[in-house]
């Protein structure tokens, strides 16, 4: 796990930690050392990560799910995806958005995605808008 902090914002790159490691971090670290505006979601959003306690401790504004298109593991897990949504955390999936660029000049975060910045010429305006949003639930998510 790596936390990168500037004057106003921080990013937490969680790697492949699971809920047991999340709980150990919560117990061992001062709360301000876990808080981050940007979270690279632990273990691609698997069902063994992103516990509610961890999300509450980190309290991110933006969560990036690093997942491959039609990955064989089904990441992110629908319950994990919903857990982030229930906390009003902006969710981005790299399989839908491509690369994610976040600029932190000032108090606000500016989030852009590769597919919204460089749409394919054959894409319609509606497809580009859907990709730019990239907050769609996984296909197997339950409402």
Task: Mark where each language-model region is.
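Binuclear metal-ion centers of metallo-dependent hydrolases, dominated by the metallo-beta-lactamase
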Residues: 69-143
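Active-site-proximal loop/helix segments of hydrolase catalytic cores
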Residues: 1-76
């Amino acid at each position: 796990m790596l936390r990168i902090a500037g004057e106003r914002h921080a990013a937490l790159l969680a790697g492949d930690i699971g809920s047991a490691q999340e709980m150990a971090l919560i117990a061992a670290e001062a709360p301000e050392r876990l808080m981050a505006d940007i979270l690279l979601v632990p273990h691609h959003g698997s069902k063994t990560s992103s516990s509610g306690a961890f999300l509450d401790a980190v309290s991110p504004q933006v969560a990036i799910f690093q997942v491959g298109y039609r990955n064989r593991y089904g990441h992110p897990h629908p319950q994990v995806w919903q857990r982030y949504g229930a906390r009003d955390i902006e969710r981005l999936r790299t399989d839908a958005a491509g690369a994610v660029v976040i600029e932190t000049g000032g108090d606000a975060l500016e989030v852009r995605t590769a597919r919204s910045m460089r749409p394919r010429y054959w894409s319609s305006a509606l497809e580009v808008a859907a990709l730019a949003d990239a907050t769609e639930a996984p296909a197997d998510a339950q409402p």
